[in-house]
């Protein structure tokens, strides 16, 4: 099962119910934090439902397609600011073999890339595909096509590559 939620997008909190606005709405950071709180609640609900599965044959994976650069006077996505591309990655399975494979693939990494997660999931589903490493990856600029350039990260060093 794949769940894709709206999550934390502008206008922050517009889709939340009043009881979900636990940080108030005094400023943009409070509004953004409300959306994070709602995401945390969703993650908890999904995780609790998975734990009720009797066979324990599941893998919970949570990540985001992008982060948000949020300050009082600036908020956006799709930039090459680390806040825009460093996103959470949570993996959990009650299956010890899957846990061991996840630890082997991700624990050595300071940064994991979506390509690495994708190949890990494909491999875990039983397909013959090696899991990508975490020594290099790319982040597209503000256009997913790459027409605005990309940030290439290799061994912890980032270099912006402009399109030809």
Residues covered by each model-derived region:
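Catalytic domains that recognize anionic headgroups
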Residues: 1-164
């Amino acid at each position: 099962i794949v769940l894709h939620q709206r999550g934390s997008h502008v206008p922050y909190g517009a889709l939340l119910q009043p009881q979900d606005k636990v940080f108030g709405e005094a400023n943009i950071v409070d509004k953004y934090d409300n959306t994070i709180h709602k995401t945390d609640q969703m993650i908890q609900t999904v995780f609790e439902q998975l734990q009720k599965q009797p066979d324990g044959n599941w893998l919970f994976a949570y990540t985001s397609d992008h982060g948000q650069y949020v300050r009082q006077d600036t908020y956006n996505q799709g930039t090459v600011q680390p806040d825009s591309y460093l996103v959470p990655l949570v993996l959990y399975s009650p299956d010890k073999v899957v846990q061991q494979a996840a630890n082997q693939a991700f624990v050595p990494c300071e940064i994991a890339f979506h390509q690495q997660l994708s190949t890990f999931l494909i491999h875990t589903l039983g397909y013959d595909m090696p899991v990508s490493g975490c020594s290099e990856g790319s982040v597209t600029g503000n256009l997913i096509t790459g027409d605005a350039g990309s940030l290439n990260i290799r061994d912890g060093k980032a270099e912006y590559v402009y399109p030809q």
